């Protein structure tokens, strides 16, 4: 789908790009995910300012919503992701994949940091909801 952002969406994307610590506080359905993904794409592939992004979200949102949003928008083609959900072996396999974005549910953050055995080497962290 072609992304034709509203002015507020362009403003929000630019705000994220210009501020290393930012919050996008909009009502449901106003495009927080695509705003954030547009900024991530720019930071990963055009500015080369980040190399690895962690998105922390509720289980359903991390498993279903974020992948659907990444796949939905034409301008995000080439954006790679891995869903770090499931059994411990499935989560470890997901972390071994080469991707720009790693999607994880909140309940697994402690495991990721303290028990997974993988370094916490993310350049950017997004906390959803």
Segment roles from a protein language model:
Residues 1-26, 30-129:
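SF2 helicase/translocase NTPase motor core
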């Amino acid at each position: 789908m072609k992304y034709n952002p509203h002015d507020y969406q362009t403003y929000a994307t630019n705000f994220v790009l210009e501020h290393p610590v930012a919050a996008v506080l909009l009502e449901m359905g106003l495009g927080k995910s695509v705003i954030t993904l547009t900024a991530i794409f720019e930071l990963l592939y055009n500015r080369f300012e980040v190399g690895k992004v962690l998105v922390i979200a509720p289980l359903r949102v991390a498993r279903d919503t974020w992948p659907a949003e990444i796949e939905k928008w034409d301008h995000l083609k080439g954006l790679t992701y891995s869903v770090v959900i499931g059994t411990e072996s499935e989560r470890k396999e997901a972390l071994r994949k080469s991707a720009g974005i790693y999607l994880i549910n909140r309940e697994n953050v402690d495991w990721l940091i303290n028990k997974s055995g993988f370094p916490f080497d993310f350049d950017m962290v997004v906390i959803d909801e």
